[in-house]
Every structure is written in structure tokens, then in C-alpha cells.
């Protein structure tokens, strides 16, 4: 069919692979196709959820960012060409450029490039959801008709609409879930502002009623929506005609659609409601239809060969404007009305600055109102734009921009109140940790850190973390780890007992945790004993409110092997062949000619492995199709889960900002709230993520301490044990570390016997070095400790930071400190250097190298020596370890070794009690216990407890739960 006029069209009913096991389309491919086809936008309307919305929004913003750069580049080129025209003073058609084009042609091409970029810049991501609307109310969950609901497409036309859609979808999950997440008309009426609604597919209320002959009921439904949504309510037409007689597809849908469409057009005219056409897209291209069919087989647990299984019409691809024009050539207004909807869509962002939860500060300390009376805006400006010593360090313009980024002066009063209270707690802790008065270095460090926390706007974060850690220790009886990750570099965190490692003593750096040159959210991971973690989370939920606390969703995708197995199963490829194909997939692909390791996916694996190429070209159609469709399904979302440790604590109801869904806790069976956006992007929306980790080793420590108390009547404060305990170092020197944390592998035992660690610093270094890559330096480290190899330094000043590791650079913090010592790098610059070296960012390193050399030369160091140091750093930096983390976990390891050395029976009983479900580990630990000379008595119904126990004589009694099958 030939058309004189192509009517613009956009897709307003689209499913991605976030319509889990129903949609097969990746968001990036959908957006790319829409842009390539010249569409002005597209909607994302996954079934019952908004899980793909952040991915959708981010990808469109990425495309727009690239287009903006292209536009500016082309604009600059056009100005240069126009200048040449003015300079020549002649017809641009007569001027020939070096590439043979005329100046006029070059200008036309440049203008065309600008137009193309502008179309992408103007592309509109339309956020929506195909919701399930309960046939009665969302609280009715008894009848068969309550199990799903009418389909309804809901689109957000502006920011208000987005937040209302978030509310609707969240409430559908939290309150209305019954087989499906269901909204109802009461909620639709309450949250209608800013929303555009269409009647959806054959599963919608109006089409269903029309098909059952209930014309009156259909009209009532249309009028209900029209009265509430007015001109933002549309009827939706679809046509999925199967034209290929040989194709196995659902041919019953199209006649029903045509019948429903007739009724919809009658109602549109009678009720004065406009109509649109959609294609209910579930996959991107026509040749993806069979892959989508396989996905439906996976979803419904059928083989492809099953004759009675569910079938789609296979017409549900993301059709081009031309294809939609052909299908709806007789209803041009249905195409044109999609443009009307696009025109209604406003530009807005779903991202937000940090939304810090409010920490309750005692009124006798101060309130926001009292601070407003006490401090002027000028006072706040000075405090938040000067350095910790009151020096002016930024311009007025930069200062005002900083105030605005922090939320304006109104927000600053809250931040200052929290910062002052944080300062009070920090100094109280500092006097307890370091004594009063503080020495000059400690005073300066705490003052600097508190200033950075305040001027970044995050004092409330630290107040909240120290609060739940304090409660965990003092009220809930939960063992808390000494810290993990870069947070241990903060002296303030140490003073607040967020961490238990002295960063000043161990040269741990605050800027490794918070870079003063770049505002970024703090990230404090906290370890709790895994028995007590749940109690801490419950306390947090009770304190802040269930509506303000949520877990974070995770998405399970079809990785390479899983895609092969899934496709092979529904195609009924023999299991032996499926397993053979999966075994061909390596854990890691070989490096290419440039030394880079390709991303693991099926196309790259096929390129690298001849046997997979043979399978792809096999004469066996089952084998060939397995590879073909596995490539198409690879990366599809297959299921959702819950982040192992990430928790959101919000100032407001979380559904004021992002959608939530629900999941079932595996242990308690309780329903958990989860954000529908995953952890990698959730903070972009302003929500604050905190990590609560369960560490089995802490449970072992806690249980060992209980065993000591029960059997010996002694209470041991594990956080206060001596760091110089001789028995503990004897244990390490002998390599008797089975059952201890992080030092129990045979290889580590061997190196410990060679090293003979005599200081805690030796243990930290071994913990950092015993990994692939830096492990090769361990023999040199051992030789230098024992004087077999001389300890050398490229510069005398390097001894200050390398002496504890015998002249070998082991930690990232050493590189940071030395860059400041040698070349006067700032704190922020040293952290940027650490990141650039660790990630091998060549451009950034090349930019920093001249500063390093010039800074070193100012101190009188030779350029050759500086070049050698730089090369050594860049070679080793990708292996260098985070000393803060190594120190924290070495302390936990030391605590386990201390208990094993000093309370062996009590400790090993705890270790075995935590290995009840693993016969191999239990046998290993039982053998170690006997080798230590401890009497291990068998199980006895009269004396055994569930777990392993220790008698007053020091014998270990076997726990009943350790008996297989009991």
C-alpha cells in the first residue's frame, strides 16, 4: 500500500523484559528503534510494575546527552563554515573544500546533523504502567474474579502524574496484591491528577464488556473514566492480524479485536472520547517473535511442541510508523491522536538530591526554630563556604551555587543543627577514645572531618548509623563488626563507635571514604552477627515507620549458560547436548589482540570458541535454534530478588518518591517492601541506602563468648582484648589457623609459618597480599621482614609510610599519602589518583603525571626517580588493597585467633555449631579440635544440647543437630 502522507505515530503501550517472562524487549533496543524511526517519544507500560522506569529514563538521558554534544559540535562547525562564506564573499556552491565537497553541501550536511541531534534531544520518555484494576475493590480477595483485574494503561504526563503513578503502583503491591498487584477505582480517583489513561487491550474493562454483550456496562465504564480524567482518557484500538498461513500463532485474537474495536468506535462517538491505536509491543523486531514465543513457554512451563499451550499472535513487535500507518490507514485520527498525547507530556526528572531522613535531636540541645533565631543566613553562608579554619576558599558565585545544591538556606538550618549535635557526640567519643585534651593532630583531623560532613550535607547520615549501632550493641545484644570498607578511614566514625579501628594509628584516610573535592553520598557498610541482623532491621523499621523503610530489589537475568539451558529445555534438545553446550562456555573469555578481556556473552563466546560456532551452524535445527534464540533471550530479566544487605531509610513515605513492590522473607515468611529500582541507581532518586550485613564470623564470636561465660564464668570483652597477645601470635606463627577468619587456607598457613608475624601490621599486610596478583610479592615481603633481602626506598621520605610493609607498596592509602608527601597532591587529588590507577584510566593518569613530576621536582627529587615511582605505582596500583577494609577484617580475624588460642574448647565448639549443615566442614573442624588435644565426647540425649557445648572440665560435647537426619 502506498501512502501520500505518513501520519506521525508513537507507541503508547509497550512492554519491556521488566514485564517478567512476558516481555522480551530490552529498553535500549526499544529506545534506539524509536529514535531511528523518527518517533517523538515512546511509553513504557510494563505489567503491574515500574521496574524498568529508571533504566528507561537513564537510557533516554544518556542518548540526549550524546545528542547534545553532537549538536554543539555541529553548531560550531556550521559557524566555521559560515565564517568561510563571509570571508570568501562568493556563492558557497562555488567553493570546493579539501574533501571535494562544496561549502554549500558541507553546510547542508551540518544542518542535517543538527536537526538529527535536535530530534534526539527532544525525544520524550513517557513513563507508564499497564495496571490491573480490581473488578470490585483491591481489598476483596476471595472470589475467582478477584485474582487479577481489568487491564488499564496509565501514563504520567508530568511530575505530579509520575508521583501519583508511583502511589498507584505501590499501593497495588502493598494493599491490593492477589495473584497480581491490583489497583482499584477508589485509588484511581484519589491519585488521578497528572495522569493519562487508556482502555488497554482485550483484557481491559471496556473491551471485555463489549465482547460479552454488556454494551451498557461498557458505556458506564467509559463515562466513569471520562468524568474523572476528562480529555486525558482515551479508548485504545489494536489489530493483530496474522497474515502468514504457515505461522503457528494465535489467530483468535484479531477477530475479537475487530469486534471490540467496532464497539469502541461507537462508544467514542457516543461519549465524546478520542481514541488511539497501539500495538501492545512485547518484542522489538518481527524476527524476535519466535524467541518471545519461547519466553512464553518458559513462563507457562510448556514445551514448544505442546499443542494446547498459550500463543501470542506474533504481531506484537515494536512496529515502525510506516507499519502502523499501514495497519490503521483507515483510521488516521487514531494515529494522529498519539501525537496529541506526546504534546501533553511535560519534561521532568525523576532524580532528586539526597532526601536525608530526620534524626530526632533532643529538644534541650536545640531545634530548627531556635537555630533560625540564633543564626542569620549570612552566618550560614560563611560557615558552609569557608574551610574548617574559617578561610574563604571559593568565590561568592561558587558559594551560592553550593548553598543551592545543599537545598537552600531553609535546609541549611536543619543541616547545621544535625552537624552541631554530631560534633557534640563526636567530641564526647574522642575524649573517651583519645583522652582529654586531644593532641593537635587528632583535634585537627576530627575538626576537618566534621566540617566536610557538614558542608556535604550529610551529618544526619552519621547520626542515624551511630544510633542503630549503639542500640544493636547496648539494647539488642547484637555483636557489631569493627567496620568494613573505606568508612574505617574516618576518625569521627571511630569516635562514634561506628567503627572500632583507630584510623590515625593505622594511617587510614578519610578522603578514601569521602573525597573533599567531590560531593558524594557516604557509604557505611555495617556487619552484624547474622542471628541479630534481623532484630536490628526490625528496630529500624519500628523507629522510622514501615512506610519509610524498604529493602532493595535485585533482578536475576538470563546469563549465557542459563539462556542456553532455558531454550534447550522448551525446545526439547537432549539434556546431554544442553550440558555439552554449557560446558563449552568458559568462566572468562580469552583476551583480544589489545589485551582486553571481552564481555561474557553468547556472541563473544561463539566468536572465541570453535565448537560453539559449529553448533550455531549445525545441520540439526534443534541445536541451531537453541543457539539462535539463546542469543535473543540472553540478558532478559527472569526473576526478582532482594538485595542481601541494602536498606532504604527515607525521610518520607518511600512511595512519595519511588515505587515499591513486595517480596517474601525466606526466613520469617513475612512480606517485605522493596523498591522497584535496583541498588545501582536508587540513590540517584534521592533515597539513602544503608548496608546491614550479616557476618557468620560475628555469630561464631558471640557464641564463643557465651560458651566462655557458661563454662568458665568469665565475661570477655572481645573488642578490648590485647593486640599484642603472645599466644595469638604463636598460633599464627605455627599456622594453626583452621577455623579462624580469613587466614585458614593451606596457602595462607604456609606463608604464616614462613613469615612469623610479630605485629598486627604484619597480619594486615598478609591479608591484603594474599590475593591473585599481589600474592607474588609475599616471598619478597617475608625475605625483607627477616633481613634476607634489604629494605630499600626510592626516596628517604617514603620510609614514613612504607616501613610497616618493608618498603613494598601494599595499600591504596600508601599511594595516596605518598602523592601528598612527594608532590603536594591535595586530599581530593590523591583520591582521584587512587581511582585512576586502580581502574587504569589512562587519560586521567596522563593528566596527573605532569603535576606529580613538577610537584616532586619542587622538593628537589630527580625526574628519573619520580618516573620510576610513577611506573611502579601504575603497575601495582590495580592490585593495591583498601587498607581500611584489610585492617578491619584483620582485627576480626585476630579476635577469632585470640579466642582459639586462649579459649580453644569454647571457640571450636562455636565454630562447629555454625557448621551443622555441612558434613565436610564439621568433620574438618572436629579433627582440628581433637588435634588441639581437646576431648570431644559423642552425642548424649542426657547431656547434649542442640549445638556443641563445653563442660566445666573443658570437654566438648557433640550437638544433637550435628547428627545427620536428626
Where are these regions (language model features)?
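Alpha-helical scaffold/interaction cores of sigma-54-like transcription cofactors
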Residues: 5-966
Amino acid at each position: 500500500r502506498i501512502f501520500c502522507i505518513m501520519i506521525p505515530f508513537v507507541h503508547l503501550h509497550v512492554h519491556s523484559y521488566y514485564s517478567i517472562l512476558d516481555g522480551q524487549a530490552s529498553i535500549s533496543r526499544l529506545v534506539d528503534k524509536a529514535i531511528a524511526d523518527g518517533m517523538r517519544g515512546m511509553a513504557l507500560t510494563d505489567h503491574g510494575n515500574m521496574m524498568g522506569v529508571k533504566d528507561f529514563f537513564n537510557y533516554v538521558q544518556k542518548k540526549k546527552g550524546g545528542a547534545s554534544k553532537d549538536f554543539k559540535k555541529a553548531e560550531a562547525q556550521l559557524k566555521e563554515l559560515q565564517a568561510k562564506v563571509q570571508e570568501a564573499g562568493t556563492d558557497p556552491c562555488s567553493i570546493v573544500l579539501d574533501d571535494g565537497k562544496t561549502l554549500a553541501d558541507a553546510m547542508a550536511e551540518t544542518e542535517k546533523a543538527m536537526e538529527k541531534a535536535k530530534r534526539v534531544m527532544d525525544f520524550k520518555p513517557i513513563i507508564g504502567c499497564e495496571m490491573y484494576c480490581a473488578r470490585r475493590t483491591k481489598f476483596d480477595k476471595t472470589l475467582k474474579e478477584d485474582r487479577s483485574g481489568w487491564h488499564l494503561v496509565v501514563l504520567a504526563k508530568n511530575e505530579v502524574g509520575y508521583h501519583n503513578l508511583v502511589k498507584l503502583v505501590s499501593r497495588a503491591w502493598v494493599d491490593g496484591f492477589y495473584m497480581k498487584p491490583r489497583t482499584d477505582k477508589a485509588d484511581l480517583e484519589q491519585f488521578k491528577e497528572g495522569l493519562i489513561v487508556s482502555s488497554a487491550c482485550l483484557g481491559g474493562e471496556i473491551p471485555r464488556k463489549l465482547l460479552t454483550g454488556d454494551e451498557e456496562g461498557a458505556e458506564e465504564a467509559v463515562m466513569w473514566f471520562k468524568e474523572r480524567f476528562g480529555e486525558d482518557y482515551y479508548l485504545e484500538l489494536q489489530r493483530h492480524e496474522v497474515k502468514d498461513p504457515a505461522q503457528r500463532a494465535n489467530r483468535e485474537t484479531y477477530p475479537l479485536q475487530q469486534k471490540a474495536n467496532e464497539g469502541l468506535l461507537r462508544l467514542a462517538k457516543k461519549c465524546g472520547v478520542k481514541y488511539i491505536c497501539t500495538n501492545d509491543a512485547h518484542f522489538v523486531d518481527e524476527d524476535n517473535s519466535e524467541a518471545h514465543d519461547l519466553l512464553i513457554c518458559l513462563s507457562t512451563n510448556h514445551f514448544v511442541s505442546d499443542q494446547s499451550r498459550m500463543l501470542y499472535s506474533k504481531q506484537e513487535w515494536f512496529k515502525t510508523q510506516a507499519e502502523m500507518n499501514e495497519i490503521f490507514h483507515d483510521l488516521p485520527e487514531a494515529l494522529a491522536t498519539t501525537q496529541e498525547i506526546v504534546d501533553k507530556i511535560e519534561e521532568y526528572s525523576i532524580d532528586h538530591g539526597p532526601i536525608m531522613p530526620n534524626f530526632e535531636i533532643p529538644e534541650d540541645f536545640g531545634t530548627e526554630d531556635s537555630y533560625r533565631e540564633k543564626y542569620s543566613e549570612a552566618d550560614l553562608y560563611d560557615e558552609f563556604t569557608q574551610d574548617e579554619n574559617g578561610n574563604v576558599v571559593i568565590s561568592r558565585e561558587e558559594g551560592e551555587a553550593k548553598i543551592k545544591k545543599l537545598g537552600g538556606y531553609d535546609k541549611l538550618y536543619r543541616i547545621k543543627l544535625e552537624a552541631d549535635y554530631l560534633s557534640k557526640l563526636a567530641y564526647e567519643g574522642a575524649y573517651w577514645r583519645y583522652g582529654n585534651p586531644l593532641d593537635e593532630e587528632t583535634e585537627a583531623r576530627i575538626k576537618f572531618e566534621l566540617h566536610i560532613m557538614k558542608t556535604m550535607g550529610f551529618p544526619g547520615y552519621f547520626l542515624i548509623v551511630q544510633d542503630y549501632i549503639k542500640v544493636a550493641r547496648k539494647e539488642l545484644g547484637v555483636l557489631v563488626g569493627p567496620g568494613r570498607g573505606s568508612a574505617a578511614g574516618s576518625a569521627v566514625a571511630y569516635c562514634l563507635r561506628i567503627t572500632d579501628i583507630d584510623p590515625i594509628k593505622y594511617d587510614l584516610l578519610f578522603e578514601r571514604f569521602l573525597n573533599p573535592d567531590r560531593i558524594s553520598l557516604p557509604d557505611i557498610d555495617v556487619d552484624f552477627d547474622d542471628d541479630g541482623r534481623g532484630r536490628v532491621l526490625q528496630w529500624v523499621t519500628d523507629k522510622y515507620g514501615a512506610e519509610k523503610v524498604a529493602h532493595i530489589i535485585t533482578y536475576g537475568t538470563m546469563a549465557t549458560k542459563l539462556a542456553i539451558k532455558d531454550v534447550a529445555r522448551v525446545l526439547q534438545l537432549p539434556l546431554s547436548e544442553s550440558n555439552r553446550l554449557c560446558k563449552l562456555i568458559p568462566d572468562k573469555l580469552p583476551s583480544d589482540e589489545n589485551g582486553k578481556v571481552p564481555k561474557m556473552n553468547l556472541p563473544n563466546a561463539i566468536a572465541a570458541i570453535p565448537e560453539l560456532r559449529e553448533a550455531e551452524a549445525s545441520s540439526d535445527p534443534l541445536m541451531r535454534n537453541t543457539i539462535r534464540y539463546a542469543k535473543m533471550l540472553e540478558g532478559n530479566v527472569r526473576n526478582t530478588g532482594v538485595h542481601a544487605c541494602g536498606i532504604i531509610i527515607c525521610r518520607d513515605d518511600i512511595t512519595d518518591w519511588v515505587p515499591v513492590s513486595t517480596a517474601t522473607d525466606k526466613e520469617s515468611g513475612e512480606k517485605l517492601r522493596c523498591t522497584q529500582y535496583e541498588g545501582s541507581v536508587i540513590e540517584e532518586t534521592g533515597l539513602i541506602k544503608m548496608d546491614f550485613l550479616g557476618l557468620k564470623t560475628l555469630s561464631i564470636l558471640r557464641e564463643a563468648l557465651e560458651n566462655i561465660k557458661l563454662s568458665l564464668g568469665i565475661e570477655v570483652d572481645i573488642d578490648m582484648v590485647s593486640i599484642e597477645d603472645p599466644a595469638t601470635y604463636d598460633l599464627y606463627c605455627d599456622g594453626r589457623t583452621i577455623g579462624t577468619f580469613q587466614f585458614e587456607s593451606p596457602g595462607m598457613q604456609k606463608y604464616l609459618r614462613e613469615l612469623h608475624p610479630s605485629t598486627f601490621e604484619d597480619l594486615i599486610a598478609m591479608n591484603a597480599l594474599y590475593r591473585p596478583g599481589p600474592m607474588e610479592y609475599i616471598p619478597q615481603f617475608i625475605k625483607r621482614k627477616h633481613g634476607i633481602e634489604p629494605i630499600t626506598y626510592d626516596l628517604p621520605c617514603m620510609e614514613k609510610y612504607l616501613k610497616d610493609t618493608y618498603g613494598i607498596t601494599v595499600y591504596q592509602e600508601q599511594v595516596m599519602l605518598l602523592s601528598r608527601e612527594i608532590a603536594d597532591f591535595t586530599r581530593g587529588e590523591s583520591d582521584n589518583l587512587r581511582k585512576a590507577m586502580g581502574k587504569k584510566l589512562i587519560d586521567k593518569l596522563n593528566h596527573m603525571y605532569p603535576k606529580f613530576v613538577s610537584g616532586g621536582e619542587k622538593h628537589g627529587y630527580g625526574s628519573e626517580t619520580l618516573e620510576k615511582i610513577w611506573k611502579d605505582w601504575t603497575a601495582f596500583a590495580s592490585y593495591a588493597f583498601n587498607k581500611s577494609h584489610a585492617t578491619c577484617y584483620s582485627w576480626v580475624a585476630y579476635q577469632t585467633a585470640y579466642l582459639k588460642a586462649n579459649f580453644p574448647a569454647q571457640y571450636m565448639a562455636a565454630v562447629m555449631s555454625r557448621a551443622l549443615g555441612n558434613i565436610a566442614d564439621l568433620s574438618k573442624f572436629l579433627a582440628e579440635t581433637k588435634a588441639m588435644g581437646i576431648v570431644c565426647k559423642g552425642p548424649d540425649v542426657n547431656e547434649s544440647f542442640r549445638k556443641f557445648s563445653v563442660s566445666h572440665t573443658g570437654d566438648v560435647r557433640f550437638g544433637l543437630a550435628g547428627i545427620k537426619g536428626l
